[in-house]
UniProtKB/Swiss-Prot annotation:
Basic residues bias spans: 373-382
Segments of skewed composition (Acidic residues): 403-416, 439-472, 491-518
Transmembrane intervals: none
Principal cellular location given in the protein's record: nucleus
Keywords linked to the UniProt accession: Nucleus, RNA-binding, RNA-mediated gene silencing
Region annotation Disordered: where it falls in the sequence: 244-318, 350-531, 579-600, 729-748
Protein name: Protein REPRESSOR OF SILENCING 3
Top-level taxon: Eukaryota
CDD domains reported for this sequence: RRM_NOL8
Phenotype on disruption: DNA hypermethylation (at CpG, CpNpG and CpNpN sites, N is A, T or C) leading to increased siRNA-mediated transcriptional gene silencing (TGS). Narrow and slightly lobed second and third pairs of true leaves. Disrupted ROS1 subcellular localization in the nucleolus.
């Protein structure tokens, strides 16, 4: 049921109605409190309620109604009174009425809008529109200078005097910029200038229409400046045309000035290299004069430009050549010529510019020469030299002792060569010339020494150099010709009279190149000519003999090599026998310990050389174990016979001139000694006597070192021999190992 009053009725919801309640029952209850306009029942699906449009008679009547009937049991139901919403149809009517009434009243915008105080600007990066205040910020805003803004809006957002004025047009801005150039010029000055220019134009009969042209003097300075804004466009056009005409016109004086500048434009680094100090001073003074004078007064100096440039180039070449060290001159100059000229290598330099040799430097007189340095190093070690006929020139010897000989030579001469190299790098051109002269004099001395030895091989060859240095050669001929070999050997051991053997080295080089025809001997002689050759000790003799026996397949290729090898062996054995004769009381092995090669020769000997006797020609195992069978002795004899045949078959005359060869019983050949001479007979007798002693000593040594063989009798037993007990134990162990496997098989 619903009740509504015209005077502001209220829609009420009455729930909990009984089935027997009707319209009249509700009117009896609500009519004393107010007026009931409409009642609507809703009875669906067990529900029973009503909407009543009620208009209360007083403000307290509605409250009294709720307090009286809300929650009351009436006709089988409990009443519930509540306020309900407005009916939707009534709401629509009201809205339609309100819309129809307001359609005639249109809102009109006011005619005068208030002035805008902000400018809304969209910032893409911020993605929002921000209002920018048009005034009152107190700061200069130059963020949007290039944006064309209408005249109604200000150009800048500032209240200062500069920006408070009205915005200017682009033409006015251009005129304002031109007037800013004329800072400090007043109108009176401009008027004076205009009057002066007008008088000048009248004298020159210039039309008054050309008064606005801009004149330029020789310094290209603008005198007339237009200050009026009306004729500014024409003035700018005239100015551009005038500048083009000035740039296109060039006077002869300006062309000469430009050519002079082109001739003098060079890089500062090039001037430092090619221009001398005097000419740089001249150019600086001329450039200063050009800076002070006008371009028309400068006269280019073309005549002196090119000759001075070529002259500076030649002087720079001379300076570069003199700035180098003296070592390259000594390398480039010929060894026989004392004068060196740059014109032979630099064709651009004339003969007058050739480099003259410097005077001999007297400061280098105190420096030690190569000969003196070698003498000092030779006195430190005890050496004995051999003749050129005894030099080994074969590849076999070169392979056997190349490492040891190179180590000895480099170790002995390294200090002298380094010191001499340091002195040579400090020397001037004179030092290189003096070295060349010294080398030539050494070569002459070597040739003289060779000739003297060829004439008298049994005499001592002494060569005197230009400096007065005496070269004394201790050769094998001296030791065999005289009985005073022991005295000379003792003196060489003390290190008092050992002289430089550079002449022997060069002599070996010359004789080997002239007399020996094979390539191998020539290459070895060239190598030996730069360094001193030491005598090979006795261990080396034995080693070379063994190598010659092993190298049986190379007999046809190296016949000359074997002959020279045998000659060297014989000479060394003769020397060692003489030493043993002089020192017989000291034991047969003491002379071999005094070998001149140093301790490195002893360390590099084979076991056959260490075990064998020093004076015997070959080594045999029978010397130590005489109980061996005769088969081994026969094999050793066959080896010795092969060595004898190998040494005797090489009888070609390719080793040295004016030398005689004789085969010895031990397979050695003595070179350069007459067979029928008295010293050779005495040496043969001494050799036989010493060989007898050595054989007896070898027999004693072999008897001492006899091998004791142990014979095991039949009664002796070994713990590891097979026996019945060992077989039984082996069977038990085998059975014990196989039992677990049998158990496994039975279980499966």
């Amino acid at each position: 049921m619903e009740e509504k009053s015209s005077g502001g009725g209220v829609r009420l919801h009455v729930g909990g109605l009984g089935e027997s309640v009707g319209r009249d029952d509700l009117l009896k209850i609500f009519s004393p409190m107010g007026t009931v306009d409409a009642v609507e029942f809703v009875r669906t699906k067990g529900r029973s309620f009503a909407y009543i449009d009620f208009s209360p008679s007083s403000t307290n009547s509605l409250t009294k109604l709720f307090s009286t009937y809300n929650g009351c049991v009436w006709k089988g139901g409990r009443l519930r009174l509540e306020k309900a919403k407005e009916h939707y149809l009534a709401r629509l009517k009201r809205e339609w009425e309100a819309a129809s009434s307001t359609s005639d009243n249109t809102i009109k915008a006011p005619s005068d809008s208030p002035p805008a105080t902000h400018l809304n600007i969209f910032f893409p990066r911020l993605r929002k529109v921000k209002p920018m205040p048009l005034s009152g910020t107190g700061k200069h805003k130059y963020s949007f200078q290039r944006v064309p803004v209408s005249s109604s809006l200000p150009r800048s957002f500032c209240d200062c005097e500069e920006h408070s004025n009205s915005s200017l047009t682009p033409r006015e801005i251009h005129l304002h910029d031109l007037e800013a150039v004329n800072v400090g010029r007043q109108e009176a000055e401009v008027n004076v200038m205009n009057s002066v220019m007008n008088k000048l134009f009248e004298k020159n009969n210039v039309d008054p229409e050309e008064d606005n042209e801009i004149e330029a003097d020789q310094d290209n300075l603008i005198i007339n400046v237009a200050s009026s804004g009306n004729d500014m466009d024409s003035a700018l056009d005239m100015l551009s045309r005038k500048r083009k005409s000035i740039l296109n016109k060039k006077t002869p004086s300006e062309e000469g000035y430009s050519e002079g500048r082109k001739g003098n434009l060079t890089h500062p680094s090039k001037n430092r290299q090619t221009i001398s100090l005097e000419e740089t001073g001249r150019q600086e003074s001329s450039q200063a004069i050009r800076g002070k004078k006008k371009p028309s007064e400068v006269v280019p100096d073309k005549s002196s430009d090119e000759p001075s440039r070529t002259k500076d180039l030649e002087q720079s070449i001379d300076n570069i050549s003199w700035s180098q060290k003296s070592s390259w001159k000594s390398l480039m100059a010929n060894g026989n010529s004392n004068d060196f000229s740059v014109s032979s290598f630099l064709p651009g330099v004339g003969s007058s510019k050739a480099v003259q040799p410097a005077p001999r430097n007297t400061d280098l007189a105190g420096l030690p020469s190569r000969e003196n340095l070698k003498k000092k190093t030779k006195r430190k070690r005890v050496t004995s030299t051999i003749m050129a006929e005894d030099l080994p020139v074969s590849d076999d010897i070169k392979r056997d002792d190349s490492d040891t000989m190179a180590d000895d030579i480099e170790r002995d001469d390294s200090d002298a060569v380094e010191y001499y190299t340091a002195c040579e790098s400090m020397a001037d051109d004179t030092a290189s010339d003096s070295v060349a002269e010294r080398d030539d004099s050494d070569a002459v001395e070597d040739d003289t020494a060779i000739d003297s030895m060829a004439d008298d091989p049994a005499s001592d060859s002494v060569a005197e150099s230009d400096d007065g240095d005496a070269v004394e050669n201790d050769t094998a001929i001296d030791s065999m010709a005289d009985d005073t070999v022991s005295n000379s050997m003792a003196e060489s051991d003390d290190g008092d009279n050992v002289e430089d053997d550079t002449a022997i080295d060069s002599m070996c080089d010359d004789t080997a190149n002239d007399d020996v025809g094979s390539d191998d001997s020539g290459s070895l002689a060239d190598t030996v000519s730069d360094t001193s050759v030491e005598a090979v000790p006795l261990e080396f003799v034995a080693n070379t003999e063994g190598d010659s026996v092993d190298g049986k397949s190379n007999v046809e290729k190296h016949e000359n090599v074997a002959e020279d090898l045998n000659a060297e062996k014989e000479s060394l054995v003769v020397k060692e026998n003489v030493v043993d004769e002089e020192e017989a009381g000291k034991g047969p092995l003491k002379a071999s310990n005094k070998s001149t090669g140093g301790s490195s020769w002893l360390q590099k000997a084979s076991w056959t050389q260490l075990v064998s006797d020093k004076n015997t020609s070959s080594f045999s195992i029978t010397q130590l174990f005489p109980d061996l069978t005769s088969d081994k002795g026969e094999a050793a004899g066959v080896i010795n016979n092969v060595g004898n045949q190998f040494s005797n078959s090489n009888q070609t005359a390719s080793a040295m001139k004016q030398t005689d060869y004789a085969s010895s019983s031990g397979g050695f050949v003595a070179a350069g000694v007459p067979v029928d001479s008295t010293p050779v007979r005495s040496l043969d007798e001494n050799r036989q006597r010493l060989n007898g002693k050595n054989v007896s000593e070898g027999a004693k040594l072999g008897a001492k070192k006899k091998i004791i063989k142990r014979k095991v009798g039949s009664g002796d037993t070994c713990t590891f021999m097979r026996s019945s007990t060992s077989l039984k134990e082996w069977a038990k162990a085998k059975k014990a190992l196989s039992e677990p496997r049998r158990k496994k098989n039975s279980e499966e």
